[in-house]
Amino acid sequence: MAEFEERPRLSIGEEEAPPYPLEKLTGGRRTRAQIHALHQQAGRVPPQAVELEQAVLGAMLIEPEAIPRALEILTPEAFYDGRHQRIFRAIVRLFEQNRGVDLLTVTEELRRTGELEQAGDTIYLSELTTRVASAANVEYHARIIAEKLLRRMIEVMTLLVGRAYDPAADAFELLDEVEAEIFRLSDVHLRKAARSMNEVVKETLERLEAIHGRPGGITGVPSGFHQLDALTGGWQRGDLIIIAARPSMGKTAFALSCRNAALHPHYGTGVAIFSLEMGAEQLAQRLLTAEAASMPRRPAPDGCATRTGVSWPARRPLSDAPIFIDDTPSLGVLELRAKCRRLKAEHDIGLVIVDYLQLMQASHMPRNANREQEIAQISRSLKALAKELNVPVVALSQLSRAVETRGGDKRPQLSDLRESGCLAGDTLITLADGRRVPIRELVSQQNFSVWALNPQTYRLERARVSRAFCTGIKPVYRLTTRLGRSIRATANHRFLTPQGWKRVDELQPGDYLALPRRIPTASTPTLTEAELALLGHLIGDGCTLPHHVIQYTSRDADLATLVAHLATKVFGSKVTPQIRKELRWYQVYLRAARPLAPGKRNPISDWLRDLGIFGLRSYEKKVPALLFCQTSEAIATFLRHLWATDGCIQMRRGKKPYPAVYYATSSYQLARDVQSLLLRLGINARLKTVAQGEKGRVQYHVKVSGREDLLRFVEKIGAVGARQRAALASVYDYLSVRTGNPNRDIIPVALWYELVREAMYQRGISHRQLHANLGMAYGGMTLFRQNLSRARALRLAEAAACPELRQLAQSDVYWDPIVSIEPDGVEEVFDLTVPGPHNFVANDIIAHNSIEQDADVVLFIYRPERYGITVDENGNPTEGIAEIIIGKQRNGPTGTVRLAFINQYARFENLTMYQPEPGTPLPETPDETILPSGPPDEAPF
């Protein structure tokens, strides 16, 4: 890593060149200091209305009804004052979560995100509420602020134009920046307000009158395939149509059949084709070949054929057709949008075709975004383009390899289009109410909430799940971290790393994964303290098998007495506890008070059966699902009594004494449950496998280590029983006189280095100044090669004035290295769609979701013969047959349309239309024969 250059701090009054070069003035990275310095140089003050900003925020704080009115007009960027941007974002977050918005809640939200001081502190927030008496004029004030934003953006454009005179500036990079700014400006300008029903109905009736009388019930742009048009009504205006298939299935050939839209005598319209894969000449050759093949097969007059076998009359319809081909490689969304706008204005195009989606480039993606999110942004941009131009946009898309690995007939499905991975069916999804549910049991459920990581704040938040679904049978891999957290996923499923989201097949041992540092808990308990305590003892040292008396065993007399007391407190006179002292143990028998008739059971047995934990042997034990829906205090009570059974709390003596705090069990499920319950108390325990050799079953230890986690255990959980309380006191005495060595809960250098480097660059802080701010001797680059503890990261964030690092230091993320990635069989897999954050907590690991398709229509091309399938389910031959599967249609039915695929011409035809003349053999290749053609003025329909 190169060392930073020493740069002087910004001095507003200096005449010399500012320390921020204009090259840094890009749409997503410019700072308020940069803009202000540039304006000072130009001698102008940026357009602003700070007093009105204060009035709008004050109105939003005192009157909740002002919030939606302001949100329709303003974005955070509309506010000139950085304090106001932070306050506005806090209000928006509270509003989106349906939480109350007032001075107190906004203050607390800013304090939670560490932005309270940057937002002006509590005094400034209080002053905002006095700036306005009511919210009556909030909409008028908001429009003035929005107008100032437009003027400010126009002025930024003027500054960018000034860069054209800089000989060191890259012209193409400058062009991209200017184009991005123009579209940011137009995006603000084109935001629409709600329209009245009267206006909408009038436009709808005019549209219906215009299409009245069209043959075939086609209301949009025809595809040229009768059965397909019967299901879709043609490609509708404002729709995004995705045509997806594996390579060599005929995606481009199918899309080029849409040339019929340009050549149709009744529905003719301009077509724009953006080919990122093939050149314009290649497309023209395919169009000519397909067009010639569609003409009547007649003897060709002399001189009417070319050497390639394509008849000259085929040129006439295509040459005159309003088809526009652009073969720019790696086309960006902004550039595509600009070209489509121009073609719409100059030629009134009615259809846009993009070939293909995965070759496009998104603009201004977040630093930790992955390819799936980039494709999703491109898809959303294409949908926005379709609505803006009011034309259908047809985008081709490559399906994932999951189609090839799936068994059966390999028909494509929607999950193949999402470019996302999947999780094994037993993966436990943490719902927002605390429950952990296997993902397979969530299939077909909708609109439930999970915990997800906000990618901007790195905090866990509630997020709604729009869909849970099965994606087929696929190979899975078991991924295990150093803490022992484990998850089984397909090779293409993504997990969060310091470098962004990565697929399983891109990960390797040693890479850091994002895990939640804590899981929020419920606010109201549903179990009493006595029930929680009794459960802890019975799960740990209880015998609850059928046809056996409920029995508890302990070596401590005080614990035996406690369990007998708890049973009486919970079940009253229904049970009669009996304590029997044996040689080394105390047995507590929890018998029913009355003799049990046939069909009657001990009330404790019924209780445990209702909780789902009756009849389990030691290696099968688990924590009831209801425990995960309790408050943190209730969970602590349960763990305190569970630890009194098979838990260890003691000081290990020797040359280097250390505290040993762990829970031991032969049940892997119980160990995972205990680890997850500790996480709800903010304790990141390690699950360790301990082999027993010939002594017995493998044991699993849930180990609490590290000063911070041990102190949380002492303070939140504690101990029960004289023996463990004394041991816990010794542990606390040891911790109270020692400092911690936080080498586990760290911020990886790969995550924080670039953030601090950018902050230093923008604020003109040199290496020496940074070390001085930290109170350290200058050490060169040594600091920048280390992982940081959270405390040290906070100090560095203050020294470098880096709010992003402060967020990471106060985040809900624990970065844990991977220890193994192993194949783990082939089975049915599943996934979720979580709009917004696009992730969720699964097996106490943060996993990416499957992004919902923005398309209005999704078509799949399926040719069975490509997979060696020679006959269909009815015994009919599949040679030359293609299925067009409508996997999704927002405003119409789904279904399958069968078409003919003429391989020689790479052309699709209506299955009933294509009838070769008897005795006319099809050529093996187009180059081996001269194609006959009809009269030059004959239409192709």
Swiss-Prot record:
A Pfam family reported for this protein in Swiss-Prot or TrEMBL: DnaB
GO molecular function annotations of the record: ATP binding; ATP hydrolysis activity; DNA binding; DNA helicase activity; endonuclease activity
Segments of this protein annotated with the region Disordered: 1-25, 914-941
SMART domains per UniProt: HintC, HintN
PTM notes: Upon expression in E.coli this protein undergoes self splicing that involves a post-translational excision of the intervening region (intein) followed by peptide ligation.
Reaction it catalyzes: Couples ATP hydrolysis with the unwinding of duplex DNA at the replication fork by translocating in the 5'-3' direction. This creates two antiparallel DNA single strands (ssDNA). The leading ssDNA polymer is the template for DNA polymerase III holoenzyme which synthesizes a continuous strand; ATP + H2O = ADP + phosphate + H(+)
GO cellular component, one term: primosome complex
Annotated ranges, domain SF4 helicase: 214-484, 646-915
Record key words, sorted: ATP-binding, Autocatalytic cleavage, DNA replication, DNA-binding, Endonuclease, Helicase, Hydrolase, Intron homing, Isomerase, Nuclease, Nucleotide-binding, Primosome, Protein splicing, Repeat
SUPFAM superfamilies referenced in this protein's UniProt entry, alphabetically: Hedgehog/intein (Hint) domain, Homing endonucleases, N-terminal domain of DnaB helicase, P-loop containing nucleoside triphosphate hydrolases
Catalytic activity, EC: 5.6.2.3, 3.1.-.-
Chain sites annotated for binding ATP: A245, R246, P247, S248, M249, G250, K251, T252
PROSITE patterns: INTEIN_C_TER, INTEIN_ENDONUCLEASE, INTEIN_N_TER, SF4_HELICASE
Domain DOD-type homing endonuclease residue range list: 534-683
UniProt key word Metal-binding: no
The keyword DNA-binding is annotated on this UniProt entry: yes
One record GO biological process: intein-mediated protein splicing
NCBIfam families referenced in this protein's UniProt entry, alphabetically: DnaB, intein_Cterm, intein_Nterm, PRK07773.1
Family of this protein: Belongs to the helicase family. DnaB subfamily.
Function: The main replicative DNA helicase, it participates in initiation and elongation during chromosome replication. Travels ahead of the DNA replisome, separating dsDNA into templates for DNA synthesis. A processive ATP-dependent 5'-3' DNA helicase it has DNA-dependent ATPase activity. The intein is an endonuclease.
Subunit structure: Homohexamer.
UniProt protein name: Replicative DNA helicase DnaB
Biological source species: Rhodothermus marinus
Gene this protein is translated from: dnaB
